[in-house]
Amino acid sequence: LAAAKRILRNPCGGARASVTTLYKTMTPKQLKPIMPEIIESIRKPGWSVMFSNNVREKGLVFLAENGISEGLDELMKIIEPDPARENEGYWFAPRVIKYFKHYRGAAKAQLPKLRQYQEAYKTSRMLSKNERFLKEMTKILDLIKKDANPPNLRSWKTL
């Protein structure tokens, strides 16, 4: 794990990508020592955009599938429709919106903000015509709202 930690700190997205295979073969508890680096690799893309977005997405999937609460926080940050980073938030949102399905009702506290994001997407230059994404977002919001049995999320720090 020491090598994986160093690789995830590498600014090259291509190098970071080599670590993502661990997400499929190890448990969150086993990866706890490198969890800060996993989260940081989601937050800050490497300079190789082609690979770094894939690394970020795989990190989000790992956290979502394992009910890690920090993953929901990162997902909210990534899909924020911030015009200052339009090529990231607007472009990346259609790729990652589906991961809210793992959080379902545990994301209810985020519904007001998600509705604001949805309205912003409807008027954005980049996503206003992306009907598939807008429909998917509506389905996700309905799923979150109607979920009567939300999953129990846990922080990676308590693993």
Give the ranges of each region predicted by the language model.
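Structural detector for internal amphipathic alpha-helices that build alpha-solenoid repeat scaffolds
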Residues: 6-9, 13-29, 49-68, 87-106, ...
